């Protein structure tokens, strides 16, 4: 059973917290993480790329010259793909890149991502972050005290003071337990769980 230290925003130890082993001590399988990350990234693709075919391109309605008698190769349109300025053959058309991943697999991948951060000792539990006012410098001070670089901070709810103070800091991303994703966990080198967010994360994945 994983027992982690709980720190305050000045990185002073305030206690300990036991994490659910079925969420934070799962064997990591890279192929599962890879599958889910690919699915999440594919789902974000717009897929709006489109080229004009010979049926949609402008012009090319009239036959360039008569079929027989000129000595030239027969041609029906100056927008044929073999002509300069002609249409494109088999070019990209709008499509949906998303593919289905079973709910059990998605949940398992999230557990694996959390487990990998704990195993690497890149998971920190912080009692809470209290800022006196909306100022980036206050959040920079907290991030410096906690030793945060590229970090994902999971907060129980989106506190405006915290969100507005952190949004201009490169590398710091805020999320709620409901928004947590495998891609975001793996994208950030550090994972910071506010103490109030630990139980909702565990409840979501049990």
From Swiss-Prot:
The keyword rRNA-binding applies. It comes from Oleidesulfovibrio alaskensis (strain ATCC BAA-1058 / DSM 17464 / G20) (Desulfovibrio alaskensis). It holds the Pfam family Ribosomal_L4. The gene is rplD. Belongs to the universal ribosomal protein uL4 family. PANTHER family: 50S RIBOSOMAL PROTEIN L4, LARGE RIBOSOMAL SUBUNIT PROTEIN UL4M. GO terms for molecular function: rRNA binding; structural constituent of ribosome. This is Large ribosomal subunit protein uL4. Residues 44-80 are annotated as: Disordered. GO terms for cellular component: ribonucleoprotein complex; ribosome. Keywords: Ribonucleoprotein, Ribosomal protein, RNA-binding, rRNA-binding. One of its GO terms (biological process) is translation. Part of the 50S ribosomal subunit. It comes from the Bacteria. Gene3D superfamilies: 3.40.1370.10. One of the primary rRNA binding proteins, this protein initially binds near the 5'-end of the 23S rRNA. It is important during the early stages of 50S assembly. It makes multiple contacts with different domains of the 23S rRNA in the assembled 50S subunit and ribosome. Forms part of the polypeptide exit tunnel. The lineage of its organism: Bacteria, Pseudomonadati, Thermodesulfobacteriota, Desulfovibrionia, Desulfovibrionales.
């Amino acid at each position: 059973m994983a027992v982690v230290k709980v720190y305050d925003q000045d990185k002073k130890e305030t206690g300990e917290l036991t994490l659910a082993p079925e969420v934070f001590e799962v064997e990591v399988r890279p192929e599962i993480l890879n599958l889910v990350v690919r699915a999440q990234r594919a789902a974000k693709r717009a897929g709006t790329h489109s080229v004009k075919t010979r049926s949609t391109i402008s012009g090319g309605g009239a036959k360039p010259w008569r079929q027989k008698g000129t000595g030239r190769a027969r041609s029906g349109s100056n927008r044929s793909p073999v002509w300069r300025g002609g249409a494109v053959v088999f070019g990209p058309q709008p499509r949906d890149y998303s593919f289905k991943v079973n709910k059990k697999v998605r949940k398992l991948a999230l557990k694996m991502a959390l487990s990998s951060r704990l195993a690497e000792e890149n998971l920190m539990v912080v009692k809470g972050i209290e800022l006196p006012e909306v100022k980036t410098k206050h959040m920079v001070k907290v991030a410096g005290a906690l030793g945060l670089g590229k970090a994902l901070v999971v907060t129980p709810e989106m506190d405006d003071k915290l969100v507005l103070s952190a949004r201009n800091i490169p590398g710091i991303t805020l999320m709620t337990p409901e928004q947590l994703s495998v891609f975001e966990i793996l994208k950030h080198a550090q994972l910071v769980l506010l103490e109030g967010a630990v139980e909702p994360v565990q409840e979501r994945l049990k």
